[in-house]
């Protein structure tokens, strides 16, 4: 039998359910505020701030959090995020990047070191679609619709990403996705089907990434 350690709210059986109260910016185990999930002792919380800073914490009730929280959730190291930003290092052209957040107690910034870079949108969709509507002297152009997963690969959060356009932009927004991730197949493979199963797995990876 697997016995968990009683640590930072951990339970001897199963995990610890954790909530975040946005009014007081504190965690609790009593059902107040946003439900973050059920945590094992080695799992952590991801905090994303409006200025692009992010960091991870444990789920200790004594933790303090800043007010300008854009997202707070259970940290998933494999979750892919899509960001569109005006890159101040690149003449404020709009860039699209896809990345995973790293576990870090020290604040990092996924928008880069230039404080003048500006976030346009941050999406957690698996297959996000981005629409660029042109403005100014380019407003006669048809809107550009980008399938983010086809446009750029998943890199580090430090990567620049890929420029969307050099034309004058009116606005950029996220559209409803037309593709959804396929549900995971939990059925046991039959004997002798190993090769077919492996092939399917490879294809699935290629489709996702």
Predicted features along the sequence, with ranges:
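C-terminal interaction appendages of subunits in large macromolecular complexes
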Residues: 1-209
């Amino acid at each position: 039998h697997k016995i968990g350690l009683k640590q930072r709210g951990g339970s001897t059986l199963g995990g610890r359910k954790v909530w975040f109260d946005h009014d007081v910016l504190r965690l609790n185990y009593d059902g107040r505020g946003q439900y973050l999930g059920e945590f094992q002792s080695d799992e952590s919380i991801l905090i994303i701030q409006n200025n692009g800073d992010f960091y991870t914490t444990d789920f200790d009730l004594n933790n303090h959090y800043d007010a300008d929280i854009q997202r707070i959730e259970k940290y998933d190291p494999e979750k892919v995020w899509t960001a569109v930003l005006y890159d101040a290092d690149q003449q404020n052209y709009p860039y699209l990047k896809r990345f995973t957040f790293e576990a870090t107690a020290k604040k990092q910034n996924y928008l880069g070191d230039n404080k003048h870079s500006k976030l346009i949108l941050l999406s957690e969709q698996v297959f996000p679609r981005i629409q660029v509507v042109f403005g100014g002297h380019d407003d006669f152009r048809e809107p550009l619709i980008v399938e983010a997963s086809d446009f750029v690969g998943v890199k580090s959060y430090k990567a620049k990403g890929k420029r969307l356009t050099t034309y004058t932009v009116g606005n950029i927004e996220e559209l409803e996705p037309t593709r959804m991730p396929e549900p995971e197949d939990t059925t046991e493979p039959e004997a002798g089907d190993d090769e077919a199963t492996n092939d399917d797995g490879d294809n699935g990876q290629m489709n996702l990434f």
